[in-house]
């Protein structure tokens, strides 16, 4: 398990933790609204759309925490709602399939974080008069990036949970296993 300095800094910056840990610790970078994690402050309130890199970046393409994972096959954008829906699908499947065993041994890591605000103008508004207000958050995903990692579960359960989560995501994904 090899982590670069950049990936360690990103994990520290975005504090990839569960909702209960966020509410207990009161971190400065991550804020909780319902069950959704998003940055508390950004340098600018509005960003440009930008382009998703088509090439595969070496950072974040290997499993770093769990035994199984979900990897993106294409570059694109993931909304904070899609990330949360996929996370809930994985947890829901594990709770149904394994009952109390998942609570004792199972663990999930979310390796993507929606940190870019998306803006939108209200309907029936004329052109001009500046950029719209922030309406949501997205994460840019590159080809081959690990989205979720799982550990403490069987291969069959992990594969089925990855299939359920893939239906919630707007990117094509594949199931990977640590070797």
Curated annotation (Swiss-Prot):
GO terms for molecular function: rRNA binding; structural constituent of ribosome. Pfam families: Ribosomal_L16 (PF00252). InterPro entries: Ribosomal_uL16, Ribosomal_uL16_bact-type, Ribosomal_uL16_CS, Ribosomal_uL16_dom, Ribosomal_uL16_sf. Disulfide bonds: none annotated. Its main location: mitochondrion. It is found in: Mitochondrion. It comes from the Eukaryota. One of its GO terms (biological process) is mitochondrial translation. Keywords: Mitochondrion, Ribonucleoprotein, Ribosomal protein. GO terms for cellular component: mitochondrial large ribosomal subunit. NCBIfam families: rplP_bact. Component of the mitochondrial ribosome large subunit. PANTHER family: 50S/60S RIBOSOMAL PROTEIN L16 (PTHR12220), LARGE RIBOSOMAL SUBUNIT PROTEIN UL16M (PTHR12220:SF24). Belongs to the universal ribosomal protein uL16 family. This is Large ribosomal subunit protein uL16m. It comes from Arabidopsis thaliana. The lineage of its organism: Eukaryota, Viridiplantae, Streptophyta, Embryophyta, Tracheophyta. The gene is RPL16.
